[in-house]
Amino acid sequence: MQVLLARLACPVYQCFHAIKIKKNYLPLCATRWSSTSVVPRITTHYTVYPRDQDKRWEGVNMERFAEEADVVIVGAGPAGLSAAARLKQLAAQHEKDIRVCLVEKAAQIGAHTLSGACLDPRALQELFPDWKEKGAPLNTPVTEDRFGILTEKYRIPVPILPGLPMNNHGNYIVRLGHLVSWMGEQAEALGVEVYPGYAAAEVLFHEDGSVKGIATNDVGIQKDGAPKTTFERGLELHAKVTIFAEGCHGHLAKQLYRKFDLRANCEPQTYGIGLKELWVIDEKKWKPGRVDHTVGWPLDRHTYGGSFLYHLNEGEPLVALGFVVGLDYQNPYLSPFREFQRWKHHPSIQPTLEGGKRIAYGARALNEGGLQCIPKLTFPGGLLIGCSPGFMNVPKIKGTHTAMKSGILAAESIFNQLTNENLQSKTIGLDVTEYEDNLKKSWVWKELYAVRNIRPSCHSILGVYGGMIYTGIFYWIFRGMEPWTLKHKGSDSDKLKPAKDCTPIEYPKPDGQISFDLLSSVALSGTNHEHDQPAHLTLKDDSVPVNRNLSIYDGPEQRFCPAGVYEFVPVEQGDGFRLQINAQNCVHCKTCDIKDPSQNINWVVPEGGGGPAYNGM
């Protein structure tokens, strides 16, 4: 990381960057390759360039060790850990021997977890009724709930009436990474085998097409794609049922959508990018238990988004603040990170932060599509839970409780099928269709159905304010029972307009006290990857970023990425520019895979243990 930051701070880069800021965009004539230029090789990953055609891999032992389990779970977030714990609870209750293995790409459980987070404890209460006695880190009950609309200089308070989605009575402000870490301890105590630092890289299939399990990724590969002397093949984990709990926009779930056509009867998912910071503030300004949400400035009415500011009771005057931007925005000049930094200077926000110290930063994509965008959840040999398919209640700004409940229901359905000797599957991998049926009968489905029209109502000519009017009238009157369902308008990647049709956005320079630059922010995420490995941000075509994205959209990847992964720099020989991928900076948010207008970027897992090292984010 230090080497990377030094390189990005070099005079050549700063000079180029200064020119770019001044002009706001590169002249279109400068973005194309000259006739004498050669497109430089960017992607070296074996998912794009198969190793069986590479002489450097001749003679390398490619055998993989395999382990058998009853259930394999990919992802140690709230959903995956809920499923794992519930399976072992049922096994103990019924005196059954069920082996449950859970793999997590982060070096430690909770290190890749990021959320606001204001937690509805309903699912936690179901899973661990004695969570208080067990010491679950829910230290801050909500004591004050505020909502407002921001103009450039003012905050217009909006009352939160009982029954509206934003009401947080009975909820807790939590550091979700700490809660996930605690859940991991409970799961291990129940007998779950938890393997942090193992990144699931491949879905394995039986000959009949059902899911057989997963394989973790290979390690010990050079940046140019050649094997190191330390090369080790990944591990195979086989199971009767594999649960995919990867979180929002999981890279294995993407493969499963295509393989089993799981999205045939739902709308394309729509997403947001959430950026978050932790601050230690002046104790005189600290209001433990206060929850504050806003919409409006600095975003225009056609750009969905908003903010949160939570006062935690963690033994020190700590606040969690963040900003969410809907990834269906249209202006390629928009930078979610810089909108976040600008928001902190609002007269209603800045006084809270003055005299304080920023101690952490991170970002993660989130599902915003709601009920209309939930895919088919089961397939032979596996199923999807949590934020992977997307159970977030968008107007409530909460998805942890619904993710946990989906994991609980999946575990109960799997247990019934594993222990029912009269139930035979037509395929080798069990198809647990009962899970989707049970989910649709649960409070999760009822909750999501009630708010299904709120997010798409923001697509009107009035934008976000039209959505607020809709919520105030129709949700208040019908409580989600209106006899229609609004639709979203296509994929987020299709929403960008050409740069020539948009106005460049002038962002103020960060002051280093309230607002900050991108690289110093990434440094606070603890992000680190093995430098000498192929970039896990792979491109289907190395020429597309310059010939299409830069030429038409002024290179939006250099703005929508909240970690400075993508840069357009001058080519070493010839005219024009090339895309540079700083994979070491990646915080695993998945925004690039979602928003790339060419859908040319494919995010795959790096070596296990790499990525951010969040501490209670």
From Swiss-Prot:
- Ligand binding (FAD): 71-85
Which is one Pfam family of this protein?
ETFQO_UQ-bd
Localisation? Mitochondrion inner membrane
Ubl conjugation among the record's keywords? no
- Which positions form the organelle transit peptide? 1-33
Intramembrane bits = 109-130, 428-447
- Source taxon at top rank: Eukaryota
- Its Enzyme Commission number? 1.5.5.1
Where is it predominantly found? mitochondrion
Where Phosphoserine occurs, the residues are: S551
Provide this UniProt record's keywords sorted from A to Z.
4Fe-4S, Acetylation, Electron transport, FAD, Flavoprotein, Iron, Iron-sulfur, Membrane, Metal-binding, Mitochondrion, Mitochondrion inner membrane, Oxidoreductase, Phosphoprotein, Transit peptide, Transport, Ubiquinone
Enzyme class, UniProt record, top EC level: oxidoreductase
A GO MF label: 4 iron, 4 sulfur cluster binding
PANTHER family documented for this protein: ELECTRON TRANSFER FLAVOPROTEIN-UBIQUINONE OXIDOREDUCTASE, ELECTRON TRANSFER FLAVOPROTEIN-UBIQUINONE OXIDOREDUCTASE, MITOCHONDRIAL
Assembly description: Monomer.
* Name of the protein this chain belongs to: Electron transfer flavoprotein-ubiquinone oxidoreductase, mitochondrial
Species classification: Eukaryota, Metazoa, Chordata, Craniata, Vertebrata
